[in-house]
Design a protein with these regions (language model features):
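Phosphate/nucleotide-binding beta-alpha loop and adjacent structural elements of enzyme active sites
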Residues: 1-193
Length: 193
């Protein structure tokens, strides 16, 4: 992220990345911090209060504009609610906590942007859905994308970005390492050179 950049933090959570991006983008840049969970958004708002170039976007991103059920099942496993453990409960599974959020299409929410330089996406397994829906923005702006992905959706994410002309890498002690099939770290995608 460079001064003047426009960025989207999808799954902003408490704002760790959003604050850093805000500082790097500077007053000429902006960061849209997407966080659908109201109690987490309160903390996010406090954490971003000195970031004049940050805007909190109170939605879950997806393929439709509608109310959705989100859930958090971390208390059952760990004894406390993990703030980064919320997921779209489109399968109706039982969870320790459920709440309603508003889903919006990212391609519509951010469709009028004049530029998009960086996207961070960490949304508990919903990354494939959201990145496919935001494909028009990825094709138009070709932003660098940092994506947390693991398990079953990782090959789908890699295939999507490869098809779009991106190359993937991971970080190892501050150095970029080309993406391999056995890599499990978060992926940075940049347009291939």
């Amino acid at each position: 992220v460079r001064p003047g950049d426009t960025a989207i933090d999808i799954g902003a959570n408490l704002g760790y990345y959003a604050r850093t991006i805000s500082r790097l983008a500077g007053p000429a840049g902006c960061i849209y911090a997407v966080e659908p969970v109201a109690p987490i958004r309160k903390v996010l708002s406090r954490n971003l209060r000195r970031c004049a170039n940050a805007e909190i976007v109170p939605y879950a991103l997806g393929t439709e504009n509608k109310p959705i059920t989100m859930a958090n099942d971390s208390a059952r496993e760990t004894g406390y609610f993990g703030t980064g453990q919320n997921f779209v409960n489109d399968g109706g599974q039982k969870a320790a906590a459920e709440f309603t959020a508003q889903m919006r299409r990212g391609s519509e929410l951010f469709g009028k942007l004049e530029r998009l330089d960086f996207v961070k996406c960490d949304i508990e397994g919903y990354e494939v859905v959201v990145m496919n829906e935001m494909r028009p923005l990825l094709e138009k702006f070709r932003p660098t994308v940092l994506i947390e992905t693991g398990g079953a959706n990782r090959p789908q994410i890699v295939a999507l970005f490869t098809e779009l002309g991106y190359r993937g890498c991971t970080l190892d002690r501050g150095r970029e390492v080309p993406l391999t099939e056995d890599s499990t770290k978060d992926i940075i995608f940049r347009i291939g050179e």
